[in-house]
Amino acid sequence: MKITISGPPGSGTTTVAKIVAEKLGLKLISAGDVFRQLAAKKGMTVEEFSQYAEENPEIDRLIDQTQKEMAEKEKNVVVEGRLSGWFVKNADLKVWIFADPEVRYSRIAKREGKDLTVVRQETRLREEFEKRRYWKFYSIDIDNWTIYDLIINSGSFDAEGVVEIILKAVEVKKIKVDQK
């Protein structure tokens, strides 16, 4: 069973992916964790590292290739990241989670203990950089949701509600854990 969970910053993908992986007994691969770890190693904020990555395509390619290879090796996995739905071609279920930008900014501000105005500006900038990078490096339009099986507004549900919707989709699609 392979599930991808994607969405913009603050939409809840990391939280939801962790819970889904735990409930289904699957391994979790998170691009965001890798990206944040690399930013910290360089002594940069996520926004600074996003700008750095725009000028250094090897960063994105390293993260994306690593995530893709890890997902291909695993039979039972939840892959979380903005591009995971695009890179994990053989996923059984591809999920896109979104929320109103103000809801997302508020979540990020709370999570990171930052001022909402600062988060709003940083997140908009980050999303602009990422959108350009994805198009420039991969010809991916991140706003094209047609590749996803399931699209959920996390502003309308708490994390557990989003998880329940995903678990119901797994049940409806009759997706099973791969025993091989």
From Swiss-Prot:
Keywords: ATP-binding, Cytoplasm, Kinase, Nucleotide-binding, Transferase
Natural source organism: Archaeoglobus fulgidus (strain ATCC 49558 / DSM 4304 / JCM 9628 / NBRC 100126 / VC-16)
GO biological process: pyrimidine nucleotide metabolic process
Protein name from the UniProt record: Cytidylate kinase
CDD domains: CMPK (cd02020)
Family matches, as InterPro entries: Cyt_kin_arch, Cytidylate_Kinase-2, Cytidylate_kinase_dom, P-loop_NTPase
Cellular component, GO, one term: cytoplasm
Superkingdom of origin organism: Archaea
Subcellular location: Cytoplasm
Main location: cytoplasm
Family statement drawn from the similarity comment of this UniProt entry: Belongs to the cytidylate kinase family. Type 2 subfamily.
Keyword ATP-binding: yes
Molecular function per GO: ATP binding; CMP kinase activity; dCMP kinase activity
EC number: 2.7.4.25
Residues the entry annotates as binding ATP: 7-15
Catalytic activity of the protein: CMP + ATP = CDP + ADP; dCMP + ATP = dCDP + ADP
